[in-house]
């Protein structure tokens, strides 16, 4: 239900917008401004009445469409100019809903407040957004924003949209401004949104618009996001079993976009040449580590406990630890010759750089398997299961499934991450949409050495997975063979906004480069 506010509050909000519009008219601004239709994409939440008052009170806004059961809005409608309001019970995120919305729009721009969000626009925000959209030629525009906090407002900068920003969970904030003409032309050129689409209509529209026009970020806060009662999107939404129908729809939409962009790859793969040079062992388990005194011994013992009919070793690349990790590794290496303790000369290595130290060393085996210094193999058969998978087909990379656990190995949500969405026909294409390949990862080293890892500490595995999948087939194991531990000292613990932006931007850049490379490969 909407939180009812006093009549005076809604009237004040509308009056504030009208007073700003009056000042703009005096300055000769509004006469040159395009008009806007606004849409609120779901039912009322906290303080939605104030947001509604702002929109109906703005001269630029000629229409406000709300999708919600009418009885939830009856009280709010009586407090504002209802001539601008249009109610619908059709889900605007669906194909039929968005089609009907676009057909009803007669203004130059469509302003959408995304599902579950409530905002308060800054003074002059609508005028500023329209100006930037017009002058930049944007088909789709979004902006930075403020968040409410106990100490006041916190600026929330977003990241710029790239050609590779094709993931369906790209963070546009709470508000987007869409050129009506751009939307209609995109649908005329690339086809209408399918009537069967339940959740991905905006995603499909965005990708179609981006094929010809810019998606523009306005790096100024245009609104304050009011705290909502819903939590943030999960890091593992794309592999949550409860979301598989949703994810399948998103994959279909992304696949069509990749085909239009001429970067979609058919399921034909380059064969792996198994006539490799001699290696000291069949397999090496690679553990990069820095300052994991609490967990590194568990990881190493898990690796050394593997049973196999072939020789293997464990290569730990100790990235100049300062917390006692080095001493623990020295003790373990002294008691088991299979443990190779490497300390690189370079002091500027990320996780990817540490992987390079291991795979280019003379100790590395023919197959390199991943084990993070926080994590454990599920049992003593993990090594055997992964290496056996390489023998089934011409795989350059094999990926298993894992279970997320706490420090004491108790399963925590979402539990099993098995990437059941992966298919031989389309897995490497859908990999451009999602955020990761899974774990544990294993590589055929002769091919891995030709590629190498980027010297980063985030996304280095994703970069290599994309590069390998461009040419070679990736094998999958769907049973859990790995424990991924989450605890307060873990590098996958909750990230701050700046780190999340940096990581998301880097992965979008990787996708951009990979899409360019695939397009060139297909044109040769």
Regions found by a protein language model. Give the residues of each.
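Glycine-rich, basic loop-to-helix element that forms the pyrophosphate-binding segment
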Residues: 92-104, 345-363
């Amino acid at each position: 239900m909407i939180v009812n506010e006093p009549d005076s509050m809604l009237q004040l909000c509308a009056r504030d917008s009208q007073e700003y519009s009056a000042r703009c008219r005096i300055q000769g601004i509004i006469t040159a401004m395009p008009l806007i239709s606004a849409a609120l994409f779901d039912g009322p939440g906290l303080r939605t009445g104030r947001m509604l008052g702002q929109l109906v009170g703005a001269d630029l806004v000629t229409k406000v469409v709300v999708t919600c059961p009418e009885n939830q809005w009856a009280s709010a409608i009586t407090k504002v100019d209802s001539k601008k309001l249009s109610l619908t019970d059709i889900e605007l995120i669906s194909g039929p809903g968005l089609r009907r919305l676009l057909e009803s729009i007669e203004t130059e721009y469509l302003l959408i407040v995304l599902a579950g969000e409530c905002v308060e626009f800054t003074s002059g925000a609508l005028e500023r957004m329209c100006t930037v959209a017009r002058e930049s030629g944007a088909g789709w525009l979004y902006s930075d924003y403020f968040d409410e906090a106990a100490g006041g407002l916190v600026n929330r900068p977003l990241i710029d949209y790239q050609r590779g920003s094709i993931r369906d969970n790209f963070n546009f904030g709470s508000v987007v401004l869409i050129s009506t003409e751009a939307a209609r032309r995109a649908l005329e050129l690339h086809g209408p949104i399918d009537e069967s689409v339940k959740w991905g209509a905006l995603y499909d529209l965005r990708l179609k618009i981006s094929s010809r026009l810019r998606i523009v970020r306005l790096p100024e806060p245009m609104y304050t996001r009011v705290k909502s009662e819903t939590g943030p999107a999960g890091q593992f939404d794309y592999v949550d079993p409860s979301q598989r129908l949703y994810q399948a729809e998103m994959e279909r939409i992304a696949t069509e976009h990749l085909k239009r962009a001429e970067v979609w790859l058919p399921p034909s793969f380059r064969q792996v040449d198994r006539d490799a040079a001699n290696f000291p062992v069949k397999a090496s388990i690679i553990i990069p580590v820095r300052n994991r005194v609490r967990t590194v011994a568990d990881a190493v013992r898990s690796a050394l406990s593997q049973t196999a009919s072939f020789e293997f070793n464990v290569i730990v690349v100790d990235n100049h630890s300062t917390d006692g990790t080095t001493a623990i590794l020295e003790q373990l290496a002294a008691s088991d010759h299979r443990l190779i303790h490497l300390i690189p000369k370079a002091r500027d290595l990320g996780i990817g750089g540490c992987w390079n130290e291991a795979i280019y060393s003379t100790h590395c085996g023919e197959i390199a398997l991943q084990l993070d210094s926080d994590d454990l193999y599920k049992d003593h058969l993990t090594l055997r299961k992964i290496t056996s998978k390489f023998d089934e087909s011409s795989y350059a990379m094999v990926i298993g499934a894992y279970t997320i656990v706490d420090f004491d190995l108790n399963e925590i949500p979402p539990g099993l991450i098995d990437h059941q969405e992966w298919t031989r026909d389309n897995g490497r294409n859908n990999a451009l949409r999602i955020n990761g390949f899974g774990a544990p990862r294993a590589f055929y080293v002769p091919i891995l050495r030709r590629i190498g890892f980027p010297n980063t500490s985030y996304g280095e595995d994703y970069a290599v997975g994309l590069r390998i999948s461009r040419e070679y087939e990736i094998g999958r194991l769907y049973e859990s063979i790995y424990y991924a531990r989450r605890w307060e000292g873990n590098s996958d613990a909750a990230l701050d906004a700046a780190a999340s932006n940096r990581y998301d931007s880097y992965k979008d850049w990787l996708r951009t480069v990979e899409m360019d490379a695939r397009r060139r490969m297909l044109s040769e």
